[in-house]
Curated annotation (Swiss-Prot):
One of its GO terms (cellular component) is extracellular space. The keyword Glycoprotein applies. This is Serine proteinase inhibitor A3K. The record marks 374-375 as: Reactive bond. Gene3D superfamilies: Alpha-1-antitrypsin, domain 1 (2.30.39.10), Antithrombin, subunit I, domain 2 (3.30.497.10), Serpins superfamily (2.10.310.10). It comes from Cavia porcellus. Residues 1-24 form the signal peptide.
Amino acid sequence: MPSAISRGLLLLAGLCYLVFGIMAEDIQVAQVPSQHMPSHKVPRSLAHFAHSMHRVLTQQSNTSNIFFSPVSIATALAMVSLGAKGDTHTQILRSLEFNLTEIAEADIHDGFQNLLHTLNRPHSEHQLTTGNGLFLDQNLKLKEKFSGDVKTLYHAEAFPTNFSNPKEAEKQINAYVEKGTQGKIVDLVKDLGADTVLALVNYIFFRGKWEKPFDVKHTTQEDFHVDANTTVKVPMMKQQGMHKAFHCSTIQSWVLLLDYEGNVTALFLLPDEGKMQHLEETLTPELVFKFLRKTETMPAYVSLPKLSISGTYDLKEVLRDLGITNVFSGAADLSGITEDMPLKISKGLHKALLTIDEEGTEAAAATVLEATRTARPPRLSFNKPFFFLIIDHSTDTPLFVGKVMDPTKK
């Protein structure tokens, strides 16, 4: 088998960031069955992808904070799939939880196009923006179809880049990311490989205000119980009133929905004592969708920590556990991107940041429910590890997914 030098593609998501590089062998193209799937089903697949992603990250470390944007990572991968062939193509779309025997690929990309259009609509109540950038080596010629599709379907901007000067290329990409995330993510790209010829960048930025803000005067320093042996002091925000809150016996957790102004909701899950693992094993996307449909309210005292956390992940490790292996190896077939040279993803990076305070949030992812009512309003004190999702409920899209094990860890 003739050898070839591998050139790198860099992928950044949520920021999500992929680096492509050149490799050796040609892979036969496999035709994906093309059957109809309504584009509104894309968010449902993203919910299952978020669930799988969280499972993998928890397996890697069950004692660390987790925070990521499934929609950002999925968008970046979907763009790569436009230029992928054969098994490389199949692995990417399967990992995104699309059934390739039932879904026409055109419906998948149309679904992403509609979703991104919806998410980027101007809102007076909150700010939610996404963006996609292609940084191209000055000597790299993209295939016309790939170039047209990523611009039309994903509204990607193309930027000529001098990758022969890695420092200047890093500066250019980082400036784009910093601007898109309003200064929240800076200097993400470092040590850019000399073989990089293309960087694909996706970012998402959200700033929302609580529909019912917390009163700063009620915020006090209190204990957060990291585990049986560790306690840390954190500022706890407090609020008393009518809340969409209930206890779910299936996941053995309290469920609290806090709405932002606009179409975004935060879903907080507080497991019963010692039941975090049970929560993570039994929570399903279907249950999450049921939670979001709950409208009943009950009186409750809510205590929630102010926090600022982030997550930075090597996507090569995470995505391999989800079944995406070819695209990072010499078996990659990304011949739909360019014919100039064989490509593979040489680096993938995802970074997401979250801030929750009294005013709101700033972030750059089958059984009967039982509402427990008591004579006295329950105290929902999130003073121990908890799980949360931030969801655009007009589309049921998981924007961010997180688990707080220690709110003092940035």
